[in-house]
């Protein structure tokens, strides 16, 4: 029986409250006072701003709100900041209200979009609000994690629905809202409903606070001995979190029995990357690492071990994700300052409370603990003074260590101030874009009036409003000049005085805003060109969001190689530094793509919000014939391999969906298959999540996660595996062409081909030829011979060298071990010979 079966015959507020609270009681849930107050206001039709601590049951209030909307025959929207949380909430609400009554919109996928309960990201709701405004069929909006309203890049999406949906009842929820008086008055004015602010400083699990001047290992040992684990140690960079985990390996965290339980739960889990091998050591010792740069499967494993109570310590960052379910008894701050991208500053009250609030698990703990470490130099000084004892002479002789130059200090006073401070008021992040104007113009009615109201009656200060008005006028003029909008002599049947001359693709700005540009750019490429497949990849890559960490690493690598070459050429330092400014990461087809984009933008001005960005991540990986591990090692990205994987998965989805089937040549199909299989073998969860969002009726989120841990054999995808084999062989050709015999030896020492063996073989080749080709023809299928021998579980392969004379009598022979390849998720081969046929 679902919650929808509990709906009373009529929507009387008292009957609704009684029905929902009776259902909760039947589930063994006793409502907290704040929950009761919020639900009474919701069923009465008021807007509710719910500001209660973490673990105080805001999700139950949200369920009660949806229940109320359904009773009133209204469409109710639930919004969350990330797609994973939207997906999780979708399945939760399906259990409560039945799958036929719940839908999901994420920009990537649309499921049961006409359902009365819709889960979506804030951007999706903002898009609907801009397009339909007061005519949207939305009776209620539940906005979770509302503090995202103040996010610099995304906060606009939390504001737009408040401005444009006056017909809706709003329930705004967060643990760290601060002063909300502006929202209270503004919502009441816009919606005509009363707005109730429900606050509670009382946590289900009370927190105690302590500031310590002991070294962190001593602090941690005491926390473990006093049963205050699990401890979440807060760091402010991913590197610090990993370094801390390594430094704690000397502390004995777990008993033998506990380590056996950890090993049992890990089971056959594959730690496939360099970081993964280190993580395996940490978690088996009872230490977790958790940050956004990790592969999703590693984060999920850490969460699984933590939920089972097997991890004593988790080393993570201050960005402990929204919706991440990691049980924590103690939060240990290593510092009370952070670098925010511009400067080092003291934590804001909201940042502090957002992390500190994770301590103490409702239903498990009777208390939570928040501990802050003093700065290291203060700790060392305290230690030296303690060693001197009470002897005044010895204490005077103690040489106090000074803080590092430029150090931003904190103290117990800082800690106490943060504890006692309310979160800062939320700052408006309103912005004007092409898509905003186009959406408003597409609406029925007077677009000028609607836009004027949006620009002058938002949450921005007047000075900022004037800036937005100037921006809107400039965009409107560009739309007129481009012929995208036209002014009408008299209003049309729907009251428009201006109208679009093009069809506005629904949701085009939410997922791949430049996908239509890519379709147009494909026509500029020559299908007969040897580089056609890679050029198609470059077009698609130019439409994707920039993975900043990857591109920075690629630029550093390019500059490092350039410096080495310039030094060898005897170029002076000043000139070297000047030349370095012109060196960036690879940008294939840059001139062609920018010219095409500027032409396309004239007739499709909304793409002006999303400039084209040429880059070469997939292409570089393919041209260098690198595996995922080799790529992250080559560019020193092991600590951010999760970001690399997310980009690869996004690129695979874009290639697969954006390129029409009739443009997918054999080479391009091979490349797409290779990329998809590589992503799946490293960590299939991102692709599984995507497929599951598109087909949620097939499996639940939990089943999708289990599936992600059960990797399919890499040899099962024959097309992709052939490309993996081809790349593995061609990687050796590229290294041989550069005469990098040391690296070849590192690859093949186990099969008897060490540096000396490779050097001897290649010396004979260089005696005969001056060059070894590595162009498109050199890596083509004609120069790779494959003999499949499934009976013996192997393939025999021969990579023929592209010598300058075209003799094609030299090459590399190898055997591919199919079972070992399935075990490791890559092409495992053993070189058998290098030389002439």
Task: List each model region and its residues.
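Conserved interdomain hinge at the start of the Helicase C-terminal
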Residues: 212-236, 243, 300-308
